[in-house]
Amino acid sequence: MTPATPRADARDNRARIIEAARDAIAAAAPDEELRLNAVAQSAGVGQGTLYRHFPTRADLLVEVYRHDVDELVALAPTLLATNSPVDALALWFDRVAEYARVKRGVFAALEASVWKDLSAHSRGPIGDAITVLLEAGRAAGAIREGVDAHDVITLISFLTRLDESEWEARARPLLAIVLDGIRASARARERGAPTTNGQPL
């Protein structure tokens, strides 16, 4: 077996650092500062390695957020490949709950100018992912007409405002309510359902 090259090792180290930081942010109490020495230890790298990849705490936080956005966006077509549109959207919303928790932790630790810029740049790709899911749902007659990505982003943005004490009890149930709200009515689903000889399949 060919030994890993230094470049591959560096990529692996970077990925482990990002994952360890993400886990730490998700598990942290409100206002708890991300401890870089703990991140390095959890990732199995030295602090020097961490600082070579991320010279400042802000650099690491920004990369954690960007990584989460990339994963969230890529997940939409992956879920549609193996699930019905409504199930894909429900599973995507489940991932949104995790993303929002990390986003809140990242933004709380960054200067306002930084997180506002990050948020502005992520809205487009996330909106595109939502559009893919909504269009698949409408094509199947499962999502109501007139709902667009901006509507969904507005509805799910409440997650970043939930108190930590309410998170486990409210985040996913509230997303389920959002999903119910954008689904087509039973009558509309029947009209949009595939048919055989005029009868729903």
Indicate residue ranges for each PLM-predicted region.
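Basic, helix-initiating cap at the start of DNA-binding domains
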Residues: 1-42
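An amphipathic alpha-helix adjacent to DNA-recognition modules
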Residues: 11-22, 33, 52-77, 87-90, ...
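An extended, acidic
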Residues: 86-201
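Amphipathic, non-transmembrane alpha-helical scaffold segments
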Residues: 10, 65, 69, 119, ...
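Solvent-exposed, amphipathic alpha-helical segments
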Residues: 20-27, 71, 75-79, 155, ...
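Short hydrophobic/aromatic patch on the recognition helix
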Residues: 44-54
